[in-house]
Amino acid sequence: ETRPLCDYLVVLIHWGVEREEMPVDHQTSLGRQCIDAGADLVVGSHPHVLQGIEYYNGKPIVYSLGNFIFSSSIPRTALLEVSLDQNGSDPELSLIPGTSSAGYTRMLTDSGDREEFYQYIESISFDISIGDDGVLSPSDQQ
């Protein structure tokens, strides 16, 4: 019902198993159902760790971005930047990597740290590529 009322539909879902780096079946199923129902982007939260990313029918599903505010025994976290334009073309999605420790979060600025972070995300994701600048794309578009 919402799809005709907006230019770009983002669905935010609280889901998943805490501290599990891979999404469980109900997450992938629900994320894909959201895309099938008209969502342009699905972003999940709750696991307190980064989870993989996939493109389903050309639309991104970001299963979890980790803990940005709260400290965690697993410090990796990220921001997701979504850049839209007025022409209605596909948005550019970028990951901004960070680490959370002792109650604060810092963004990674060292190129080696960023590259290691992107390689990790690719390893837990599903057929995606991440450029040196953090831009996400389906592997078949690289």
Give each language-model segment a name.
Residues 1-142:
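Acidic, metal/ion-coordinating pockets
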